[in-house]
Amino acid sequence: MNGKLIEGGIVLTKVIIAVIIGILEGNGAVYFFNKMPGTWLCDYGETPSDELLNPTTQRIKSSPWKYLFSMGFVILNIKLVMDDWQYAIAASAVLLILLELSLADKKYSIVPDQLVILLCITAIGFIPFHGSWKAQLFGGLIGFGLMTAIALVGKFAYKRESIGGGDIKLFFALGLISGIKGILFIFAATALISAACFAYLLSKKRVKITDSLPMVPYISVAAALYMVFLWYINFSFLF
């Protein structure tokens, strides 16, 4: 009986902590994006606009986004912490950074290098969950190589930039985090999700066949899907 009470207390404690951190992350995501240095949201050599330089400007509205983000983080954190609290710390940090990157790409068509660097740093927290650090390094190189190859094919085939340098660097960072199998899954899932969304928007005549969409939101959804639900699944039958 005492053992069950202790176990129940541990579970309750994990849930409470996950809820508190989720609320902080949801509110913090909105606050940080609104206070992010304007230079982070510009291309190299570009002068930030008055909107980006104005500290009172709400780049995204506090309501309803802080509530929606908080709910999302609470749900995901509970799932993560019930699986492995140590993994949950690293994964939750990655999800927060991916949200900031998605907002930046969606609103300003930019992938801040500073956030990508932070993402690379979080890869340190995943070292215990890989058989070898080499898997992380190779994952990063594979992610970088795949996106670079697609960028080159797009440039030569369509005579225009199909994938930005920020997307390539982001895949390198995610490869460091998820390893070889993880980055291959994220790559495939990104392609499927983005293609499905583009086809839907095309059918509704919201985009043209020649249009391009921000990739980071799709990459982030694919990465979140893998990290939250599929990390511990063995994909050896596929790879």
What are these regions, as identified by a protein language model?
Residues 2-239:
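A membrane-topology feature that recognizes alpha-helical transmembrane segments
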